[in-house]
Amino acid sequence: GPMGIMGPRGPPGASGAPGPQGFQGPAGEPGEPGQTGPAGARAGEDGHPGKPGRPGERGVVGPQGARGFPGTPGIPGFKGHNGIDGIKGQPGAPGVKGEPGAPGENGTPGQAGARGIPGERGRVGAPGPAGARGSDGSVGPVGPAGPIGSAGPPGFPGAPGPKGEIGPVGNPGPAGPAGPRGEVGIPGISGPVGPPGNPGANGITGAKGAAGIPGVAGAPGIPGPRGIPGPAGAAGATGARGIVGEPGPAGSKGESGNKGEPGAAGPQGPPGPSGEEGKRGPNGEPGSTGPAGPPGIRGIPGADGRAGVMGPAGSRGASGPAGVRGPNGDSGRPGEPGIMGPRGFPGSPGNIGPAGKEGPVGIPGIDGRPGPIGPAGARGEPGNIGFPGPKGPSGEPGKPGDKGDAGIAGARGAPGPDGNNGAQGPPGPQGVQGGKGEQGPAGPPGFQGIPGPAGTAGEVGKPGERGIPGEFGIPGPAGARGPPGESGAAGPAGPIGSRGPSGPPGPDGNKGEPGVIGAPGTAGPSGPSGIPGERGAAGIPGGKGEIGNPGRDGARGAPGAVGAPGPAGANGDRGEAGAAGPAGPAGPRGEVGPAGPNGFAGPAGAAGQPGAKGERGPKGENGPVGPTGPVGAAGPSGPNGPPGPAGSRGDGGPPGVTGFPGAAGRTGPPGPSGISGPPGPPGAAGKGDQGPVGRAGETGASGPPGFAGEKGPSGEPGTAGPPGTPGPQGIIGAPGIIGIPGSRGIPGVAGSIGEPGPIGIAGPPGARGPPGAVGAPGVNGAPGEAGRDGNPGSDGPPGRGYPGNAGPVGAVGAPGPHGPVGPTGKRGEPGPVGSVGPVGAVGPRGPSGPQGVRGHNGIQGIPGIAGQHGDQGAPGSVGPAGPRGPAGPTGPVGKDSGQPGTVGPAGVRGSQ
């Protein structure tokens, strides 16, 4: 039909459920191995948790993540009548993502809006050649913040954030028991190399990234041939999500944009009703460990971080068997730092930190190219029949349809009432066939038809070709620094769980401003022809009536009842995507719905542009003293100092007490071999009494440096010294270098079809869309049931056809009652035709004569001029019923099928 005028924009949708949790980012590069400290005498007892340290400085806002996978298409619902295609509005500017709120209850459903008037049926034209792709449009103005949409697909993991502050070394925990072996998952692609260093405490939640770039809306396909409209059926249940299409390849890295001025925050929208909390999904099977990634590049050593929160005391592990003591080895020089080890297992996600303040609105990104079209989902069950709507305006009469198949002869009808006695007249001449009567006026809407059987489901479409990668968006400005939050204890990353069921949809939001009319999209290919409807039941044939006098033209009869709708045709191929329209204003921001389930892990996306560095905050106060750390490893020995000048030899003092053995010195260079002296005489092997301990002698002058002696055996490890005092707080380290972007990952496994969601609230009627191309003529439908008898029409003027050939003389009828015999006169010449006199009273009916032989059809006369409709006369008095006459012959099968009836009233729009 022709394009309708765009109606007012519907109210914005309610806040959708927040998107599923993003994928676990790649694990950071392990830090450099520290030097091995001396072994302790035994494992120390677990210390008590210390006071929480001061939260770290807020990190720099990371770049916007790559666009998420396209959503899976839902199962198509029961096909309704072809509606009027509305003009597609312009996509609004992406709104600022709100903070997740607590799940609320479902709001009360709004009243269903009236359905729009269906447009006239057009004929489907042949699909035109595909046009060349247009150039990307310019970026539209920034609109106000729009409502939060429904939960989108999980996004790609963003680039690794800046390096956190190095926390103090924690006490080694005992080894936990080995977990059960997980099922083999899809091998992941190595993520980008993160900056080295020990993980710092959880930072404050970063500012929310801007919403993803909206995809280009596809153009509406060419409407298929329109059948006789039946009543509007209720919408089927929302289908489950279809299989996720293959993601397109990652686009090339864009150049860094200039830092933009922070935009003004949008107005706070009124809070919508909270949605009902969805069921929690089952825990997924733990995935198997992926292959170890390549060793990363050594990062810049980070500055000392602030003390992190002490983790809970772990249970003490079982003591291992005592090892056999090995021989003492030579003391070697400190070795070079070893090669980076393989990446460790991903840790479980830590506790969620407090939400930071909302950042300013970012610059909207450039529209991305359309993604691949997903395969068509399975066909849904037919919906319930809706209530008939109010009567719509009468449409223009349609063109006469093609000749339908002849119906089966029906059973004999019940006998009709006896007619009035008519005067027996002589058989008149065979009249010529009159011209076709005028089209009757549209009748009242027919009864609601029985819905036809569901059509066969279309074949599942093949996955579309990989889309052109979209351009990277301009990084948004850095958000204002939020207040320091409590540091959360970083726990180990757990396995990614399986996808849970979708949460219930949120209620509709407030009404937004109408969008600007976008350019009409290109026409898609025509859909396949629908399945012909079933043949209707044959009508009951009427009894043979007596041949009456030829009546005058009747008034227009009422159209027949609308036949039952035929089965729905298969879904047509999806048309090519049209160009995106300019952005329209976004509606007010709605409240956040309940949290959605975790999605499947997807491949790591390419790293975006680094965000602008935030301003350095004021230096915080010194936090409380943390728990005593373990004794650090001994550092390498320093170099020997230069020898001092030789002093004069002092007097020998009395022998001093034996001091503690000193630390072994560095092994000096071997001295020259001395000359062997003569052997001395053997001394007497006696032992005297031990004398008293002498007092300590005066320190003598430093003698010349002696040669280094032989290395003594390694001593037993000493007892742990007292804990050292905590050192001063170090400066905050510079953010680490952004890692190399990883290669594109393998697309994730398609999720299973979820449970159908609850029936949504009916939205307002859509605007009248542009007229579609003329469709191909559809398959002839089965002949409809016979229409109801129309009201008797008023008499028209007599026609002026040529007289037909005289028919054969019929058999002589039975003699009537004798009347008075008049004188027989000569037959006069026919006089002029007199005006029609008033209808006389009905005389008594004479006996019917035998049926005459049917005459041949006369030559068709010239159609007479259609007369004006006369006023309907008052009904005459009914005469007494005469005896029933013999049944007349069955008439020939009609040729033309009736004109289609008027379009029935629009039904109440079904729920989604």
Swiss-Prot record:
Instruction: Return the Gly residues bias intervals.
Output: 431-440, 539-548, 647-656
Give the compositionally biased regions (Basic and acidic residues).
43-57
**Biased composition annotated in UniProt, kind: Low complexity:** 1-41, 124-153, 178-192, 229-244, 295-327, 360-382, 406-424, 474-501, 517-532, 549-612, 622-637, 658-667, 728-739, 763-785, 805-815, 830-850
Which compartments does it reside in? Answer: Secreted; Secreted, Extracellular space; Secreted, Extracellular space, Extracellular matrix
Query: What Gene Ontology terms describe what this protein does at the molecular function level?
Result: extracellular matrix structural constituent conferring tensile strength
Q: In which tissues is it expressed?
A: Forms the fibrils of tendon, ligaments and bones. In bones, the fibrils are mineralized with calcium hydroxyapatite.
**Where is the segment annotated Disordered?**
1-206, 222-739, 763-912
Keyword annotations for this protein, in alphabetical order, are:
Calcium, Collagen, Extracellular matrix, Hydroxylation, Repeat, Secreted
Q: How is it modified after translation?
A: Prolines at the third position of the tripeptide repeating unit (G-X-Y) are hydroxylated in some or all of the chains.
Q: Name one GO cellular component term.
A: collagen type I trimer
InterPro entries in alphabetical order: Collagen (IPR008160), Collagen_superfamily (IPR050149)
Give a GO biological-process term: extracellular matrix organization
User: What is stated as this protein's family in its record?
Assistant: Belongs to the fibrillar collagen family.
* Miscellaneous remark of the record: These protein fragments were extracted from fossils. The tryptic peptides required multiple purification steps in order to eliminate contaminants and to increase the concentration of peptidic material.
The protein's role, per its UniProt record: Type I collagen is a member of group I collagen (fibrillar forming collagen).
Assembly with partners or alone: Trimers of one alpha 2(I) and two alpha 1(I) chains. Interacts (via C-terminus) with TMEM131 (via PapD-L domain); the interaction is direct and is involved in assembly and TRAPPIII ER-to-Golgi transport complex-dependent secretion of collagen.
From the Swiss-Prot or TrEMBL record, give the protein name.
Collagen alpha-2(I) chain
Which species is the source of this protein?
A: Equus sp
